[in-house]
C-alpha cells in the first residue's frame, strides 16, 4: 500500500468525524463521539506509523476500513465487544495456557487487532 492510500484513509476518517451525528441526537453526545473518533484515529495511525512491511500495512488498513464500516452501520464509533471462546479464560499453566492464548488470539476480530490486550 502506498503512502497516498494511507493518507487518503486517514482523511476519510477525519471527514467522517467532522460530519458525525450521534444516534441519540444530543449535541453533547455528538461532540464526545466526534472527539473520540478523531483521537482514536490519531492514536492508531501514529502507533502504526513506523510499520514498513506491506502486509502489515494492508492488515492495518483493512482493520481501519472494517471499523469505519461497522461504525457507520451501527452509528456507534466505539469498538464492538468481543467474547472469549470457550476455555479461553481458564487459569492453566504450560501447554494448556499456550493453547488458551492461541484461542484468544484467533478469536480477536480484524477490527480490533490494534487494541491492546486487557
UniProtKB/Swiss-Prot annotation:
Listed Pfam families: Complex1_LYR
Lineage top rank: taxon: Eukaryota
Comp. bias (Basic residues): 93-107
Residues covered by region (Disordered): 91-118
Signal peptide: none
Family: Belongs to the complex I LYR family.
Descriptive protein name: LYR motif containing protein 1
Organism: Danio rerio
Gene name of the record: lyrm1
Amino acid at each position: 500500500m502506498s503512502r497516498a492510500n494511507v493518507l487518503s484513509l486517514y482523511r476519510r476518517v477525519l471527514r467522517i468525524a467532522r460530519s458525525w451525528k450521534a444516534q441519540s441526537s444530543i449535541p453533547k453526545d455528538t461532540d464526545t463521539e466526534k472527539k473520540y473518533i478523531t483521537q482514536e484515529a490519531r492514536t492508531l495511525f501514529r502507533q502504526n506509523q513506523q510499520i514498513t512491511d506491506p502486509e502489515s500495512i494492508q492488515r492495518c488498513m483493512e482493520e481501519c476500513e472494517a471499523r469505519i464500516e461497522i461504525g457507520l452501520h451501527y452509528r456507534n464509533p466505539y469498538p464492538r465487544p468481543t467474547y472469549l471462546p470457550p476455555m479461553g479464560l481458564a487459569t492453566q499453566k504450560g501447554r494448556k495456557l499456550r493453547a488458551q492464548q492461541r484461542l484468544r488470539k484467533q478469536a480477536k476480530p480484524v477490527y480490533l487487532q490494534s487494541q491492546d490486550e486487557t
